Structures are given as structure tokens and as C-alpha cells.
Amino acid sequence: MRSEITRETKLLFDLPQDVIEEIFSKVPVTCLRRIRSTCKRLYALLKDRGFIRKHFAKSARQYHALMLKNFRFYSVSFNPNGTEMDVASLFNGERSLIDPYSSSEAIISQAFHCDGLLLCTTKENRLVVLNPFSGQTKWLQPQNRCKIDEAYVLGYDNSDLCHSYKILSFPDLYEQELETIKNAGRDLDVTPEGDLELKTDDFSSNSWRRNLGVTPHGGLGLKIYDFSSNSWKKLDVITPEGCLKSYGVSLKGNAYWVYMSKRRGVNDYSLLSFDFSTESFQHLCVPFHQEADCFGTMALSVVREEHLSLLYQSCETLKVEIWMTKEIDTTFVSWKKFLTVDLEPHLPHLLMFSCRMSFFIDEEKKVAVCCDRDNKVHVVGEDEYRVSSGFYFLDFEGITCCLTVFGYVPRLV
């Protein structure tokens, strides 16, 4: 069998170079990864930037669901009738990532997707950017080791012809925010009949405000890592005062969060964006009522690197609404509704998604695959609700890895 592969490969490379490039430019990235080691000429071709540009322009970029589970990446797929979910290791048993500073396998606890790249945080609190299909990595220097109480998002400067990647670092005060809300008088109870009761006190506008750019000790907490200079710098910009209600996501170089502030004692929601070109923030509209209940769940996802998707679940009705952007730029966004699901009939299996949830949209089957801190996978659609509970939770030397799912479009570089 080995000789047959070698002979076929040799015959292929007897063809003119432009014909070879044309053939391989139509092969999906995931297949190229599997065959690149068959010969040196093919390996060199896949490293050639001219071929990479041609492949990017001509190939249909496949849309995948990736899952971070137990410190490793997996691909997620459904069987043809959509009743079962298959989870397969992305690296097929290979060691996923080697830390060059310790020469041991890197244990990944968090991941952020941008443009086919994964910004990963390891258990040693180091940052590495990984292309899981090409195997390329970029590690930040050890002296730039990240902090446990910081969050990171990856984006790029759209003003450059070639993407100039940057990392935004900001204080992750989620646990402090929870404690502040708890002390402010929030109680969450379930009655004997299974109803959800929410008791709140009146909050003044300053009682549980979180400033995105100010650390608990008062100093500016925003920093930018520029890949072109391989260095960090402090970011001196006007930062919004309020609360991030979702994980961040990246679309076409910009980062986005669901954001909440108080205006005259009333909750005010918006889509907060960070433009890596101008290194500034911008507020955009959200599709649901801006005065939604403050304990509802909001989450963002990216669909095919073309649209943002926003999930909103009311804590009063448990109804889930999922929206997708029709258009989005730096100053304008329009939305269309993708899905509405009432989860109340499925109690007591599910009460409320947390604001640390993640989800993936399957447009063809019109379902959302949701992961939460209970380490279960919830599949919700207009006429269905399923939960997969066969996922176990690992704790590695005190570092946890919550189940996370996101859409992913692979790229060669």
C-alpha cells in the first residue's frame, strides 16, 4: 500500500506546477493536513504563500464545531438523522501541543477563536496562538506570562493588507462581580413546585458597577500585545463603565461582548465592540429589549466567520431567543431572529443557562448546541431538546477546564 501511495504521488508531481496548484487549491484544509507528510514537495507546496493565497481564494472554507473538553480540542459532528453527536479528537491521538519552555505537553484550560487561529491559555498561565490544522504556533515570552484574573481576546488590524494580529488583555472580574451581586441582595430559589423564584433588592447605579478598564486597585487594566513588535503596551483609552454579560468573540478582526450599564437606575444593554485598528470601543444595538432583566443569560457566537449570533434567555420565562446579524460594521448592526425555544416544559432538566455558557449554531438543522458549566451538552431546537451528560469534569492541579464549544473555519496559516 505504501508503494502505491508513493507511485501515485510521483505521477501527480509529474504534472505542470500550475496544474498541481489548481488541484490542491480545491482540496479542503482538513484533508491537506492529513496528506502533507506524504512527500517533501507537497509539504513545501503547503508552506508556499502564493499557494496559500490561491487556496484561500478558491477553496470552500469548511465550517466546523470545535470543543474544548478536558484540556484537549475535539471536532463535533452529528449523524445524518441528527439524533446523536460524535466527538472525535482533533489530533487523532497525537500530542496536541508542546510547551517549549518546559518541554512537556501543554495543558490548555481556555481558548479563544479568531480567523482560524486559537488563542490558548495553558495551566501555567502562558499564552500561545495555535493553528490546529497547520500545526503552527506562536508562544508569548515567559516574562509575559498571563495572570489568572485577566481575560484575553485575539483580533487583527483591518487597515493592514496582511492581518496584523493583536491581543487585548483586560481584568476578568467575573467572580468579584458575582460576589457583589450576592452581597447586594440577590437570592435564587426553586419552590417545591419547581418554579424559579428570583428575589432582588433595588440596586443603586453604583452598587454593582464594574469598570472594564479599571482593576480592583484602581489602575488602568487594558493592555495590547502587538505581534508585529512582540511586545505589550498599556492602552490609554476611555473605557466603558458597566458589566460584561458574555464571553467575548471575534468577527472580521473586531472583538464583541454583550454589555450592560445603568442609566437612571434602569438596565441598558448594548453590543460592545473593540476595533483593533483604532484600538477603541464602540456601542451597537442588541435585538432584544434594552431593558431586559439583569439576571437573564446572554451569549455570543460566530457563524461561518460571517455573522454574529446572540442568545438571550429570560430568567422570568426561561424562553431562549437566538438572533443572527444581517449586516454589521463599525457603527451599525441589523439583526434577524434565528430560533425561539421555550425551555420551561423541559424542567427540571434545565433551569437556566449561566452567563459563562457557549454555543454553536447548526443552520441546516436549525439547532443550537450549548455547553455550560454543568459540563453537559444541550441541543435545543424549535421542536426538540436533548442533553448529553456523558462528559466528565477534570481538575488538573487545581486548574479547571469548562466544556466550551464554538464554530471554526480552518485555514492554512
From Swiss-Prot:
Gene3D superfamilies: 1.20.1280.50. Pfam families: F-box, FBA_1. Disulfide bonds: none annotated. Residues 9-55 form the F-box domain. InterPro entries: F-box-assoc_dom_typ1 (IPR006527), F-box-assoc_interact_dom (IPR017451), F-box-like_dom_sf (IPR036047), F-box_dom (IPR001810), Quino_amine_DH_bsu (IPR011044), SCF_F-box_component (IPR050796). PANTHER family: BNACNNG10540D PROTEIN (PTHR31672). This is Putative F-box protein At3g17560. It comes from Arabidopsis thaliana.
